[in-house]
Amino acid sequence: MSVFTAVSFEQMQQWLKGYDLGELLDLQGIASGITNTNYFVATGTGRYVLTLFEEHSAEELPNFLDLMTHLAERGIPCPYPVKNIAGQALGELNGKPAALVSCLAGKSLDNPSPQHCAAIGEVLARMHLAGASFEVSIINLRCQRWRIARLPRWAPFLDAENXRMLDAQLEFEQAFDTSALSRGVIHADLFRDNVLMDGDKVGGVLDFYYAWNDVLFYDIAIAVXDWCVNADGTRDVGRVRAFLDAYHAVRPLTEEEHAAWPGMLRVAGIRFWLSRLNDLHFPQAGELIHAKDPAYFERILRKAIAAREQLLTMWVDS
């Protein structure tokens, strides 16, 4: 959630005239994150988060805002989109699509405990169940075709060893069979910096703007690779099991998902390794930029490749 498009106090005052939220009291840019422009907004009626969308078109965004509304109304701790006086949740500010959502309690964690991992596992399972009644299907914007199309621009930044690993992983992903796995709407970016923890409870799940319909277990693999991983890329057994046990208690995991577990971690690893590589070497212009190190996900991917049998033992108690 970096600041790429500046918004002045006066511009925000003018924009808020379209809302019934009272007087603007404070406006602060949010430096963390890598894709959209975000500000904390304080008014006479409370605190909100303003997002200016740097990549999505206005036509794409209503599905994401509708999903957030759908989940929030079913008890999932996620931001609730605020509608303006015309009844619209999406507007435009400084030439960019813009939305205002509720500001939730809590803070992101650098070093989550097993209790924190259990809390986010439980919320993710509830989110998957709540999303089953969301009737809109959202298309994946960063699928394998997206990665393959960008291989020529990434090639100069890969040494020979990484280029061989990339070729092998793309071949693996293409052959990876997920037809027996449950599908639905997934968050697809459930990293620690997209979750607010309020004590040992989840205060808020943020940034649904890369959600899409896919294999539910892919969401688990993405989250585990950030919440339950040590600095060297190895999985922390206690945190992994706490996450999976809590998820399983809400939406029971299947034997097919168990068999797919090591492979799904590889698929998640390659996506984020290449996405971070892209964001590092081809950044958007902006005032406050925060790019994440692709080497972190390179390590996670390598460990997932090397530790298949060990990963199969990191599973729920049956």
Curated annotation (Swiss-Prot):
The keyword Iron-sulfur does not apply. GO terms for molecular function: ATP binding; homoserine kinase activity. Its EC number is 2.7.1.39. It catalyses: L-homoserine + ATP = O-phospho-L-homoserine + ADP + H(+). It comes from the Bacteria. Pathway: Amino-acid biosynthesis; L-threonine biosynthesis; L-threonine from L-aspartate: step 4/5. Keywords: Amino-acid biosynthesis, ATP-binding, Kinase, Nucleotide-binding, Threonine biosynthesis, Transferase. GO terms for biological process: threonine biosynthetic process. Pfam families: APH. Belongs to the pseudomonas-type ThrB family. This is Homoserine kinase. It comes from Methylobacillus glycogenes. The gene is thrB.
